[in-house]
A protein has these predicted regions:
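Short loop->beta-strand "edge-of-pocket" segments that line small-molecule binding or catalytic clefts
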Residues: 44-54, 68, 154-172
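Soluble extramembrane regions of membrane proteins in the secretory/endomembrane system
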Residues: 136, 144, 165, 186-191, ...
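A ligand-binding cleft/hinge motif common to bilobed small-molecule-binding domains
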Residues: 95-101, 109-127, 173-178, 202-221
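Ligand-binding clefts/hinges and TM-proximal coupling segments of bilobed small-molecule sensing domains
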Residues: 6-42, 169-192
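Solvent-exposed coil/turn segments that connect beta secondary-structure elements
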Residues: 23, 53-56, 93-94, 112-114, ...
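Extracytoplasmic small-molecule ligand-binding "clamshell" domains
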Residues: 1, 12, 17, 22, ...
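Flexible hinge/capping segments at coil-to-helix
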Residues: 134, 145-162, 181
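Short Pro/Gly-enriched coil loops immediately N-terminal to beta-strands
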Residues: 125-144, 193
């Protein structure tokens, strides 16, 4: 049902507007179908619990007493069209499958990844028990420096401090680059995800950060 609603939101321009707001451009790849909900008939009202990672700015993040981000506003648009009440539940990426299986959340939305330590067979079994949407936005992890920085190569960062979020995907990506890791003086994990990392970089508290390309698009558009 949510997938059908997303097709309608793509057709009426809602997703395009959200993408421009958060990224400055629309690189989303949602299927578009203005009549996707027509065959579903009456849609019963319900409460929809969105499991989100609150450190994946600008997709989903803690904002004061609530949450904000592209995925959060997209979920709001989905529930508004379906007549559902939206609730949020903060979850860790590594626990997404458990949270879904236990019924604590109806959907894991915003930065969810399958456990990279799982075997291929284990991943396939998990996928068979979940309904997955097609990927709708390419989001890469990048090593980022300030525009006025003297650092221009990985080797030039030798002995410096690099910040990254607490989510395991950041450290896993960095650890996979052994040669690069050996150059750093310190790879420091901070709470607050990409948002906190960009704020520290702007303040000159570190030489570089590991952050999402979606966050870079937000800060540079």
């Amino acid at each position: 049902m949510c997938s059908s609603d997303l097709k309608v939101l793509a057709a009426d321009g809602t997703i395009h507007s959200l993408a421009l707001k958060w990224f400055g451009t629309d690189n989303t790849t949602f299927d578009s179908d203005a009549g996707a909900l027509d065959a579903l008939g009456d849609i019963p009202q319900r409460t929809f619990i969105m499991g989100l990672n609150e450190e994946r700015f600008p997709m989903s993040y803690a904002d004061g007493d609530g949450y904000s981000g592209f995925d959060v506003e997209l979920a709001q648009a989905v529930c508004a069209r379906l007549g559902w009440t939206l609730q949020y539940q903060s979850i860790a990426n590594r626990n997404a499958y458990v949270e879904l299986s236990s019924g604590n959340v109806d959907c894991a939305w915003g930065g969810m990844v399958l456990d990279q330590t799982d075997s291929k067979d284990s991943k396939n079994k998990k996928k068979q028990k979940m309904t997955l949407t097609a990927p709708y936005l390419e989001n890469r992890l990048l090593l980022i420096v300030r525009g006025d920085s003297k650092y221009r190569t990985g080797s030039s960062l030798k002995g410096t401090t690099v910040l990254l979020g607490t989510d395991e995907t950041y450290m896993a990506a960095l650890s996979s680059e052994e040669k690069l890791m050996k150059n750093f003086g310190t790879a420091q994990r901070v709470t607050g995800g990409s948002k906190a990392c960009f704020e520290a970089l702007a303040a000159g508290s570190c030489a570089a950060i590991v952050a999402d390309s979606a966050a870079l698009a937000y800060y540079t558009h």
